[in-house]
């Protein structure tokens, strides 16, 4: 019973990937903006940074799901734990990065740019595990 509850709580933590990031002190989710046009206001810049973060998160979620499905149960549990803790780290690291402009209208943009950048870096790490070559001793799955 306790193990099942723990599994559900860990799954909930990963399912709320975006929600955890949104829980930072940057306010509500910005309204969608056409970022193909040059944004004219700080609010539009903030919204475009958030949209970039959402795109980075979608790619990260895809890589995570693919890797999770390609490893055994023990590795899947470890991956879930690592990903949950990484999300918490990313949020705190970006809070630190934006602390110099906290309270300013640019703070949300700095936060979302940081989170998008870190998420793309994490996606690259997950992709490395997905595409490891034979002989790579850090490979956690069977090489292709």
Question: Can you say where each PLM-predicted feature lies in the sequence?
Answer:
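Bacterial N-terminal signal peptides that target proteins for export
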Residues: 1-12
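N-terminal signal peptide c-region/cleavage motif recognized by signal peptidases
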Residues: 16-18
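N-terminal alpha-helical modules
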Residues: 22-144
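Leucine-biased recognition of intrinsically disordered, low-complexity hydrophobic segments
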Residues: 9, 20-22
